[in-house]
Amino acid sequence: MNEELLKKMQRIKPEISNEVTDKGYVLTLSGRVSKNYWEDDDNICVETIDNELKDVEGDITIRLNSGGGDVFEGIEIYNYLKSLDNTVIIEVTALAASAASIIAMAGDEIKMSTGS
């Protein structure tokens, strides 16, 4: 992998946030795909996503920006999202590389921002 690209991927600021809009529930996932091994980890993991989405009714939009990470965690997140009865819309806001590309494929609809 290109060293410059690797450095850019590592600089993606971790963020997990949510909001309810007139179009449904929006979950922003930014950062590394990996299990949370420590209490203060901010990784994108199935446990965090389950905590955010388990009681959501209606459409779910996931805004995704990640350089990837643990492929097995990515597969677990994919399987979790596919198991939901909700319509899942994935919006790739900048980057969905490696394990994050697996997560992106879980959407019933996938939108890519210009330049992503």
What positions do the PLM features span?
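N-terminal organellar transit peptides
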Residues: M1-A99, M105-S116
